[in-house]
A protein has these predicted regions:
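Ferredoxin-type iron-sulfur electron-transfer modules and their immediate structural context
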Residues: 1-312, 316-320
């Protein structure tokens, strides 16, 4: 069987779906709910393509080729529908890609990462991160107006984290060796998509006050899975800088469920693609139906989940910590 993709004739191999044919031919087709050699069901519509013969827009991850198809993967109409699909997914994705404190730091310091290392008792690493930005023991905070503390989400709950005091504490620890393992990364690239989680409800504020136990008081807003997040990657490629629609998800923000070992699950970041459900035996499952549907992990099923499952998650909802 031969079909045409972007005016190029391609012979179809037995059992291939459109997305597999297109990718084998070198065409880039994004996808969120599809992973090669994994069980899946089409739901995201990010992989949509157009059959110019019928005029139909079809999900390429679950559609099998038919003789005579003429497929478009990169037309303006296809790109527009993919962008809309991404924006709808983002309305269900309640999370920060980057911590506000890091985004506003005038020195380019990854403030949230430093606080994470500090709270984990990894003071040498935290000081090494500072050394990549400041000529220790001197720091640039004395003349700074502390935009990091003004942007701190903890400040909307009760009191902002005393970031400058922690920086000065670490800078003064001359007993801690500095390793050249960090470099400054500008996280303020205006072309990169940045998700925002929105405002905390009063109930969430009370819950955060009660459950946040980090020595610094930091809520650790930055997403632990942002480096491998397809949602952020494709949103950036589509030219989406900020979500068009308000976040409609009411799942508890910052709820982190320990699955097992190094694996964690954050329901508020989940787009309900189902990959973790379809590819775990008596593990993750769906709860409820329609707009209220959620992906959950029953307590008694946690031991059945394999760590490789985290690699299937297209967002930072399911991830491994170092």
């Amino acid at each position: 069987m031969v079909i045409t993709i972007n005016n190029k004739e391609i012979e179809v191999l037995e059992g291939e779906t459109l997305i597999e044919v297109a990718r084998r031919a070198g065409f880039r087709v994004p996808s969120m709910c599809y992973a090669k050699e994994a069980k899946h069901k089409s739901s995201c519509m990010v992989c949509v393509v157009r059959n110019s013969v019928s005029g139909q827009m079809i999900p390429s991850c679950s559609t099998y080729p038919v003789e005579g198809m003429r497929i478009e993967t990169d037309s303006e109409e296809v790109s527009r529908l993919r962008a809309l699909s991404l924006e709808l997914l983002l309305s269900d994705h309640r999370a920060d890609c980057e911590a506000p404190c890091t985004l506003v730091c005038t020195q380019g310091l990854d403030v949230e990462r430093m606080l994470y290392l500090y709270d984990a008792g990894r003071y040498g690493e935290a000081r090494s991160l500072l050394a990549a930005v400041f000529p220790l023991p001197a720091v640039g905070c004395d003349t700074c107006k502390a935009p990091c503390e003004k942007a701190c989400r903890r400040g909307t709950v009760d009191k902002a984290v005393e970031i400058r005091a922690i920086i000065k504490e670490l800078a003064g620890r001359v007993d801690l060796p500095v390793e050249d393992v960090y470099h400054v990364v500008d996280k303020r690239d205006k072309n990169v998509f940045i998700s925002r989680l929105g405002r905390f409800t009063m109930k969430e504020k009370e819950w955060l006050k009660e459950t946040t136990s980090a020595p610094s008081g930091c809520l650790h807003c930055a997403c632990g899975g942002k480096a491998d997040c397809k949602l952020r990657l494709y949103a950036t490629e589509a030219g989406i800088k900020r979500p068009r629609y308000e976040v409609s998800s009411m799942l508890p923000v910052k709820e982190k469920i320990h699955v097992k070992d190094q694996m964690w699950f954050e329901p508020a970041k989940c787009i309900r693609c189902g990959l973790c459900v379809y590819n775990s035996e008596n593990g993750f499952t769906f709860k409820n139906r329609g707009f209220g549907m959620q992906v959950v992990i029953p307590e008694e099923s946690k031991t059945n989940v394999k760590k490789e499952l985290a690699g299937l998650c297209p967002t930072g909802a399911l991830y491994l910590v170092d």
